Design a protein with these regions (language model features):
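Solvent-exposed, non-transmembrane regions of membrane-associated and secreted proteins
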Residues: 19, 25, 36-228
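N-terminal Lys/Arg-rich, disordered targeting/topogenic segments
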Residues: 1-35
Length: 228
């Protein structure tokens, strides 16, 4: 009730009645939702906040992986030009580009970074230390996350071609021969078999909600004669 409404009351009794009505109105406003309704509203707000955080965090991870490729591409170009020491994508990076993958049918390409630790895979595919460098003789093992760069492997087919550009600028062609699911502790996929091959590794299944898991999806490709 407005001050004008209080002023219209006649005498002290009228003022008391007006004040009583005013306070009664304020008490009614203060009651609003009862306790169960307030708790329900609070729970709904908490759920909305948690959902926004989860979605935002996932979007940030994906965005970081994609946007970092711009800086990584620049470092890769410098390395192809013979940069010594190898160019790093950003000043505090503890990795450097060592190769480039091109999935021919999907028309997608991505730069491979040195190392396969989590801090590397957050920004792109990583080369497993100790395996052959991309485009070099032997078994080159490359890993990436299933929900960013290696999400493309879900659509991989036997017979697909993958081109690999090595640090010297040479481009080699590999043909996908096998698609397998193995236990995370099965290291046979990283073995050197005396042939030139490319082994791509990511977590499986692709639609899993939790990160990691006990299974790995393995795409194996063998080097082809350079006819393309």
């Amino acid at each position: 009730m407005t001050a004008r409404g209080i002023g219209n009351s006649a005498g002290p009794a009228g003022e008391c009645q007006a004040v009583a009505r005013f306070h009664g109105h304020r008490e009614a406003e203060g009651r609003g939702l009862d306790l169960p309704d307030r708790l329900l509203a609070l729970a709904a707000l908490l759920l909305l906040a948690a959902g926004a955080w989860f979605i935002g965090d996932a979007a940030w991870m994906k965005g970081k992986a994609v946007l970092a490729q711009v800086l990584i591409q620049r470092a890769w170009a410098a390395n192809l030009d013979g940069a010594k020491p190898r160019e790093r994508p950003w000043s505090w990076a503890d990795t450097t580009p060592v190769g480039r993958l091109e999935f021919v049918r999907q028309r997608r390409s991505m730069i491979v970074l040195a190392g396969d630790a989590g801090r590397v895979l957050a920004f792109g595919p990583g080369h497993r230390p100790g395996s052959a460098l991309p485009g070099k003789p032997g078994n080159s093992v490359i890993s990436a996350h299933r929900d960013t760069h290696f999400a493309i492997l879900e659509g991989a087919r036997i017979g697909d071609l993958v081109r690999v550009e090595n640090i010297e600028g040479q481009t080699l062609t590999y043909r996908i021969d096998a698609l397998d699911v193995v236990d995370e502790h099965d290291l046979s996929v990283t073995e050197q078999r005396g042939i030139d091959q490319l082994t791509l590794v990511t977590c499986w299944p692709f639609n899993a909600l939790a990160p990691g898991g006990p299974w790995r999806y393995i795409v194996t490709a063998s080097r082809q004669q350079d006819r393309l």
